[in-house]
């Protein structure tokens, strides 16, 4: 049944990825099997952007494969299985919001460049590529890589700079880190977690920005503590025989500490009033007003508590 549901409701995904997902589900108990199936379908059905172009399809496939692999790790039972299903569903919702925000930003960028010629756009794209290559090449050791990124149909550099790891908390909400090379100093897949930070600026919302920024930074810290670094959370969820403490020992404390450090540092520096303009410069942005009758600070802390529960249960 799960195989039939997966094939029926995930037409945009390659058959191989869908089959891997279903094979994973069939190895679990019946109720756990259903929970994981629902969580994966939630991830896909919330996808609101049509996957017509090759770039969007490639990105969606990579993200989907990343989350499916994370859900397969551990082969847990009982409440751990429920927590895995919840985490996959929440991460899927995050990615869906990321795609929706990217689609809106592409439309705004097209409107901003209405008076430019094709030659001008080509020159701008070339300048962005040269600048991006220079920043990636000159990145020092121990840094998070942020590069200029061009979406389909958009030639504007949205993100700039390379932030030192020690400054990651300070710039986590001010600077959207949209993309990195597949391999950052030998750590494969690190760009997947860094992409979460891009949603903070793309969504232009303090509450959602907290979830995105805290999730990106604390998960990056947790994964960076793994000496046996493989592929995303799979390395952190799989026990390794290693003479030194690895992610199964330090991952949970780092994730919790990273979440709290993110919100405390950003609140102290007034980071919720900062954002990244499409020109690549850090500056003030307009946020929507908070929900009437709700304290923004209290809302941030409640959302952070929910994030910690989901990541650590």
Curated annotation (Swiss-Prot):
Keyword Signal applies: no
Disulfide bonds: none
Keywords from the named record: Proto-oncogene
Disordered, as annotated region: 107-129
Protein's UniProt keywords contain rRNA processing: no
Signal peptide range: none
Source organism, top-level taxon: Eukaryota
Designated name of the protein: Myeloma-overexpressed gene protein
Organism lineage string: Eukaryota, Metazoa, Chordata, Craniata, Vertebrata
């Amino acid at each position: 049944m799960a195989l039939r549901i997966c094939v029926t409701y995930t037409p945009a995904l390659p058959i191989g990825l869908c089959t891997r997902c279903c094979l994973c589900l069939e190895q679990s108990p019946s109720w756990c099997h259903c929970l994981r199936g629902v969580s994966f379908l939630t991830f896909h059905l919330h996808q609101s952007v049509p996957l017509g172009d090759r770039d969007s399809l490639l990105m969606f496939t990579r993200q989907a494969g990343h989350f499916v692999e994370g859900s397969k790790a551990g082969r847990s039972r009982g409440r751990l299985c429920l927590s895995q299903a919840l985490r996959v569903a929440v991460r899927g919702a995050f990615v869906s919001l990321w795609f929706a925000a990217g689609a809106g930003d592409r439309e705004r960028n097209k409107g901003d460049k209405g008076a430019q010629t094709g030659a001008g756009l080509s020159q701008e794209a070339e300048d962005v590529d040269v600048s991006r290559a220079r920043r990636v090449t000159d990145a020092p050791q121990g840094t998070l890589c942020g590069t200029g990124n061009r979406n389909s149909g958009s030639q504007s550099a949205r993100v700039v700079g390379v932030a030192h790891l020690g400054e990651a908390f300070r710039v986590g909400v001010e600077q959207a880190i949209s993309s990195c090379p597949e391999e950052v100093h030998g750590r494969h897949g690190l760009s997947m977690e860094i992409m979460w930070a891009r949603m903070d600026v793309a969504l232009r919302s303090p509450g959602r920005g907290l979830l995105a920024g805290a999730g990106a930074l604390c998960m990056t810290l947790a994964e960076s503590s793994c000496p046996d670094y493989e592929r995303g959370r799979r390395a952190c969820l799989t026990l390794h025989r290693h003479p030194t403490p690895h992610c199964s020992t330090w991952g949970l404390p780092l994730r919790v500490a990273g979440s709290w450090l993110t919100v405390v540092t950003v609140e102290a520096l007034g980071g919720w009033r900062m954002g990244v303009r499409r020109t690549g410069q850090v500056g003030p942005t307009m946020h929507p007003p908070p929900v009437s009758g709700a304290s923004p600070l209290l809302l941030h802390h409640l959302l952070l508590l929910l994030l910690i529960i989901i990541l650590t249960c």
